[in-house]
Amino acid sequence: WISNAVEGGVLAILAKTDPEAEPRHKGMSLFLVEKSSEFQVSKRMKKLGYKGIDSGEFVLDDLFVPGENLIGGVEGRGLQQILSGLELGRINVAARGVGIAKACLLKSVEYAQVRKTFGKPIADHQSIQIKLADMATQVESARLLTEQAAAAYDKGERCDMEAGMAKLAASEAALYNSLEAMRLHGAY
């Protein structure tokens, strides 16, 4: 499967170009491939979230790719090229998670100030304040981890661990705050 397989016209394909290379990952190269009759998408994959970019299974049938389509001009560096994008990808996912978590917090605060029980806004109840404080803590911790990873990336430093931690924390924050926001909006 590959991202943008259905809607994309040009795709990056990682292919084994030297079957004798040791270790085995050394014999992979990255190519830009235009979709053609030799490149067929067999089906669009169903996704739970992040539907802005499609994913699809594809079949390559006697596909010929000219050497000039080799990315970077050096054969055998494909896996390294693919892996080098993981840090930035994880930071981007973390940033989305922070945005979701923060939006849930802001909407929850807004609603808690308007919704009333027992004659006062629910924001005045300690149990709601604790919930909102926990949500704010999730946002800030995820944001700080994401900014730390992004700063390291911008400096050209290795940040695979930081990016992974930020992605995990921000994804968990987005889930936690989404569930808490639904609970808080229960009477909406």
PLM regions: where:
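A short core secondary-structure module
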Residues: 1-40
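Basic, amphipathic alpha-helical recognition segments used for DNA target recognition
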Residues: 33-38, 67-68, 102
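Short, well-ordered turn and helix-capping elements at secondary-structure junctions
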Residues: 17-19, 43-45, 64, 188
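Flexible, small-/acidic-enriched active-site or ligand-binding loops
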Residues: 38-63
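Alpha-helical interface subdomain recognition
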Residues: 57-63, 73-77, 81-188
